[in-house]
Design a protein with these regions (language model features):
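Bacterial N-terminal signal peptides
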Residues: 14-27
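N-terminal helical capping/dimerization or prosegment-like subdomains
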Residues: 33-126, 348, 363-364
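Histidine/acidic-residue-rich, glycine-tolerant segments that coordinate divalent metal ions
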Residues: 173-256
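Sec/Tat signal peptide C-region and signal peptidase I cleavage site
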Residues: 28-32
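Active-site metal-coordination/substrate-binding segment of hydrolases
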Residues: 110-180
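An extended, acidic, His-containing surface patch that forms the Zn2+-binding/catalytic region
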Residues: 108-110, 215-217, 274-340, 347-348, ...
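Bacterial N-terminal signal peptides that target proteins for export
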Residues: 2-17
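A short core secondary-structure module
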Residues: 193-194, 250-274
């Protein structure tokens, strides 16, 4: 799961790998975990073993060979479980970029379903961690290790359940396909290749992404909500550069490059892009309103009914950064450089502007608006990262009802909320290629446990096993 963005798909070419999986058995599993530290039932022990093995691989951008080995290890487990060699394939769309695709063959009466995860992680500095980041720890009811949350638990949800269902002899009414990428945190080359050049390996009615959505606890441990990601904002980055002749600092000029750039930054900081809602964000506002105080809930419902309600939009935007990011496109300065000596006038100054653009909004319109804001200043605008447009995925009633039923069966009266994420995942490549994607990680966590990319990344032991069991049920439910 990228918190800070993705890179281009310009180099999406090369060889591929495919793994295909089939599932079966009508019985519904129990979510019971006797104790986070007791001996586990066989299927839960399998999940823990896979997670431990995965965390042991330092599958970072600096260690692509470790990413390859992690994918090979999962391929070996699947083949040992009975998947034919031709249905478990490793791919390398470009040098240092690896993936795995698995096909679980079914009766093939319906279009296949696709399940997504990524095996790569961001770098971790061992000295800063309380536990070795690349060795699975288990303490105080948590699994600790780099990638436990993002996204090796997701890989485990898929691989362990494919193995379990294969051994149980269950055959679905359609093929089930797993596509596991090894570069989601950096370039997204593998997912882009799967969605385009390798489309025949992953073509499906829709995809379920383990790297988005999930359950949310309150600070006191009550289950608050279950999120389904249906869309993502477009990630786009610009550089604004002011230049002039420079000179000696004892002879100031009115066209100082840093001063010009500061004016541009100030104008952009004072600008709000318009509120634009889509079906996902309208439903998100309506369904999540009950989780907020009455005044906020009223504003949420009012805005869902009328996106031109500027008063409601302003109250929500100023009270919560998450609301502001959900309602509108945002463009903010993230990096700054300029000048070459303390006693010299700067010849140039540059600011990096990172934009998160609402689905359905054209990136060129945002660039034109930035140009309008700084039009009278001598500043160049350059795109340094060209994002990939990814529209919202329509959410069929039957799919939503299936997820709601599973959530209620296992966790009771928990509101299910379709949502738009402000970050980026592999899902954007599939949406862009025409495959609907729904983020359903099913992992519950407290705000204090959101440590992806950070120190002492962790997930609850019970929450992990419950999410794997939920996926077991979901695979069987959706494949019929």
């Amino acid at each position: 799961m990228k918190k800070a963005g993705i890179s281009t798909l310009d180099k999406c070419f090369g060889t591929t790998l495919l793994v295909i999986l089939v599932l079966g058995l009508p019985t519904v599993p129990s979510f019971a975990v006797e104790s986070p530290f007791s001996d586990l039932p066989a299927h839960q022990q399998l999940s823990e073993d896979i997670l431990r093995e995965l965390v042991g691989f330092e599958s970072t951008v600096e260690r692509p060979e470790q990413t390859s080995k992690a994918l090979q290890a999962m391929a070996a487990r699947l083949r040992d479980a009975g998947f034919p060699k031709e249905d478990v394939q490793l791919v390398r769309p470009a040098e240092g970029h690896y993936g795995l695709v698995v096909r679980y063959r079914g009766i093939a009466e319906k279009q296949p379903l696709l399940f997504l995860a990524h095996i790569d992680v961001v770098t971790a500095t061992p000295d800063a961690w309380a536990f070795p980041p690349f060795s699975l720890g288990k303490k105080d009811g948590y699994y600790v290790g780099r990638g436990t949350e993002d996204n090796k638990a997701g890989v485990t949800q898929i691989v362990s359940n494919f193995i379990r269902l294969k051994k149980e002899g269950w055959v679905p009414n359609r093929d089930l396909i797993a596509a596991i990428s090894g570069d989601e945190e950096t370039t997204g080359t593998v997912a882009a290749w799967f969605a385009n050049e390798g489309r025949d390996l992953v073509d499906a009615q829709y995809a379920i992404n383990s790297d988005a959505g999930g359950g949310e606890y309150t600070d006191t441990g009550e289950r608050r909500a279950f999120w389904i990601q249906t869309s993502e904002k477009l990630y786009q980055t610009y550089e604004l550069t002011a230049t002039n002749e420079g000179g000696h600092s004892s002879l100031p000029r009115p066209d100082n490059a840093i001063q010009e750039l500061a004016i541009a930054i100030t104008r952009l900081a004072g600008h709000q892009f318009p509120v634009i809602l889509n079906d996902s964000t309208r439903m998100q506002l309506r369904r999540s309103a009950s989780l907020y105080p009455d005044n906020t809930a009223r504003d949420m419902r009012a805005l869902a009914d009328n996106e031109n309600d500027q008063a409601a939009a302003q109250r929500l935007s100023t009270g919560d950064a998450a609301f502001n990011a959900t309602l509108r496109t945002t463009c903010i300065p993230t990096m700054l450089r300029g000048g070459h000596a303390e006693n010299a006038l700067p010849r140039d100054a540059t600011v990096t502007i990172n934009c998160r653009i609402l689905p359905g909004t054209e990136a060129i319109d945002i660039e034109n608006e930035i140009a309008r804001l700084i039009g009278d200043l001598d500043i160049d605008i350059n795109i340094i990262y060209q994002g990939l447009a990814s529209g919202p995925s329509d959410l069929p009633d039957a799919f939503l009802e299936s997820i709601e039923s599973l959530v209620e069966e296992n966790w009771g009266d928990v509101v299910v909320i379709p949502s738009m994420s402000t970050g980026a995942t592999d899902g954007l490549f599939y949406r862009n290629a025409g495959i609907p994607v729904y983020g359903v990680s099913a992992m519950f966590s407290k705000p204090d446990d959101w440590r992806a990319h950070g120190l002492d990344e962790r997930i609850g032991v019970r929450d992990f096993h419950e999410s794997v069991a939920f996926w077991y049920q979901m695979l069987k439910t959706l494949s019929h």
